């Protein structure tokens, strides 16, 4: 178990943030230990669509992290199959206002040398005949974007690092204490093991109550509960990431459009937005379709107030809206689930350095799959500059 060994970097948390911190540090020749409390990580990094869509991120900040992440994903895919598929993203407008936003968004992307193409309603339907004619006003296609399988991507990257980059990894290894001692970080596990690191990164997701809880201000963090579902395998018809009208109204990039502040919201849209619902589709290799999602929020530290139920009302609202958008072979629901992630309220990610050697990276919210590789690349670069 390498007990008492000192590493350049110890990382607590095997999700996407921890995994890519390890990846970038190893690429810089650092010795890295990755500790995971469970048999394998299974939280927000895995309970998502697996869409890498920089197009939805706030322009001139997280949009750039998303573009960098896409390159990292594609470069890594050339070395090992981490499930990246360059299939592009479709935004589908449901009314004239959303179509105006797509037109403005295309120009904003052009200004940033990010390829996109606008399609009329008839062109969109010709390429995507499963969309319903009465829903579609037009579409915007971004060819460079990609999808991944969230159930396998992080695991495959970790195995690649173990086999090829010298990563040391321990699962079933809950960390119960982190402190600075003798000028470096001392990490203690529930099995009474001690590890040492010149630096330690805490990337432990929504579990903020165990390690240094006093450094997670509840006023700056909230927890989101989302609901998603998987429809039964069926004929392959969705060739790209599919993002719809409510997504156009929700995603940060569109807030940069000149007309965004002027759009009208109907009472039906407001009912869905009250549950944080916008509709995304992604079809997996086995033909199953991931559909969602919704968003509810509580302050950090109050996640028990969510309860443990998956709301059938929310699922029915999502299915009803999805059926307005597209025709499918069947709408049989194979499984439903809830996901939880920590999100900053005053910043797009929560970072803090404690005693010069302990680094907290958390609260990246729902943009982890799209932006984590790029964001962690910059963080590790600064750490070792």
Regions found by a protein language model. Name each.
Residues 141-185, 189-191, 195-199:
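Helical element adjacent to the flavin cofactor pocket in flavoenzyme catalytic cores
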Residues 2-15:
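Beta1/beta-strand and adjacent pyrophosphate-binding region of the FAD-binding site
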Residues 178-183, 193-283, 304:
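Flavin-dependent oxidoreductases
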Residues 276, 285-290, 296-385:
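C-terminal catalytic lobe of FAD-dependent flavoproteins
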Residues 64-65, 92-101, 140-159, 309-314, ...:
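Short beta-strand to alpha-helix junction loop
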Residues 81-91, 125-165, 356-357, 362:
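Helix-loop-beta segment of a Rossmann-like dinucleotide-binding subdomain
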Residues 27-46:
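Glycine-rich FAD pyrophosphate-binding loop
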Residues 49-127:
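Dinucleotide-binding Rossmann-like beta1-alpha1 core, especially the glycine-rich loop
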